Amino acid sequence: MVFKRLLGAFGVGGPSVDTVLAVSRVSPGGFLTGEVRVKGGDFEAEIEHISLGLVTRIETEHSEGEHTGLGEFFRTEVSGPFKLGIGEERTVPFRVPVPWETPLTEVQGQPLNGMAMGVRTELAIAKAVDKGDLDPFSVAALPSQEAVLVAFSQLGFHFKSADLETGHLYGVQQRLPFYQEIEFYPPAQHSGRINEVELTFVADAGRLDIILEADKRGGHGSGHDSFGRFQVTHEQALQMDWPAEITAWLDGLAGQHHGGSHGVSYGGHDDGHHGHHGHYGHHEQHGHRSGPGMGAVVAAGAAGVVGGFVAAEAIDEIGDFFEGEEEEE
């Protein structure tokens, strides 16, 4: 038994863990449900806790360029300490809240190229190597978000890519330390003066911020970015004529002939259709660009972020997941 415990300290013959999701698709603000199945190994083990973390990939910008790192942006414990006997099997059900600002990985059933999401299970074992499991899941758009994305498709925008950036958006109540950029190629009628348009959603239970950023072409390389912002409730977003709103914003860009970052802000008025014009600032710690697409506009793909970087062992595990490999315990 002493020899088995010694081997257990190196991860040999220890407990195993497998997480089974009840559903593999959620929306921001929803719940990820399922159960963690634990099985005892060749020796009795002291389990310290079982935790679940939502993980993805994010791009950060520094003096030497851009860096892609893996991390988790939400973590919760689903079980406290307990003893696990030799060969004993236990099942721990869970219901984990999905943050409202969780980035999207698909639209209308089509994957967003550049995005992926996973839930990592950690089985912390006293005096032994911790065990883990990693399971992918997808994040579908809220109806209010999908209404905007559908409008982009109707206007002839073509999805380019999506990614996550560290930092916060100026003037936006943002909880997570990153934001998603969904990048589009403009329709033909705007391609002569706009390189691309980026779309960012920042949601909470009652409100949706929609931030638009146009990378404008300029003579002799003097292009600049222009911004637009809509702040509405989820109900208002479903009632708005988004093709008309986006078109009006694009048409307004044509009258901007001077450099710098400019924009139009639309407040959440009672009818949800009108706003006010104003100056809009740039992203704080803004890095690389990206954007979203819809149905026919969306391509397939994988990848996405950070709240605190995880340990090296977890990074290797997550890296395998984002490369599409299956983890073997």
Regions found by a protein language model. Name each.
Residues 2-53, 63, 71-93, 97, ...:
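N-terminal leader-region detector that preferentially activates on the first domain or presequence
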Residues 84, 102-112, 201:
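Exposed beta-sheet edge/beta-hairpin loop segments within beta-rich domains
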Residues 67:
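A glycine-rich, hydrophobic loop/mini-helix early in the fold
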Residues 297-311:
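Hydrophobic alpha-helical topogenic segments used for membrane insertion/localization
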Residues 53-58, 95-101, 109-128:
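Internal, hydrophobic beta-strand segments that form the core of beta-sheet-rich folds
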